[in-house]
Amino acid sequence: MSRVRTKTVKKASRVLIEKYYTRMTNDFHNNKRVCDEVAIIGSKPLRNKIAGYITHLMRRIERGPVRGISIKLQEEERERRDNYMPEISTVDPSQLTSIKVDTDTSDMLKAAGFNLPNVTVEDQGKNKGK
């Protein structure tokens, strides 16, 4: 059965990961050694708890972004995704030849006041039996 981690352990782990991300791994013993080198931690059990939580967080970071931890690599990746612009727009009017809709959708477009030139009405074979 596991224990609840205190906010001291969580905060210290997050700070250490943000500052020394490149030195941390999924290995508890390596993280324990890095904690000894870079931080002044009051007791051995506290150091072990922090190193254990760092190991836990590093495994989570491998799977995806973790809330509360901002790593420069993740920030750059997020910026790249947010600023992505496709070369050819899928809704570019010059690229669209025609939009195929059924009669109900056509009626809704007319009722809403949309006057789209590329709309062609197609009858659906499966809706005729209603």
Swiss-Prot record:
Residues 74-84 have a biased composition (Basic and acidic residues). One of its GO terms (cellular component) is ribonucleoprotein complex. Keywords: Ribonucleoprotein, Ribosomal protein. The keyword Chloroplast does not apply. One of its GO terms (biological process) is translation. It comes from the Eukaryota. The gene is rps-17. GO terms for molecular function: structural constituent of ribosome. Belongs to the eukaryotic ribosomal protein eS17 family. InterPro entries: Ribosomal_eS17, Ribosomal_eS17_CS, Ribosomal_eS17_sf. This is Small ribosomal subunit protein eS17. Residues 74-97 are annotated as: Disordered.
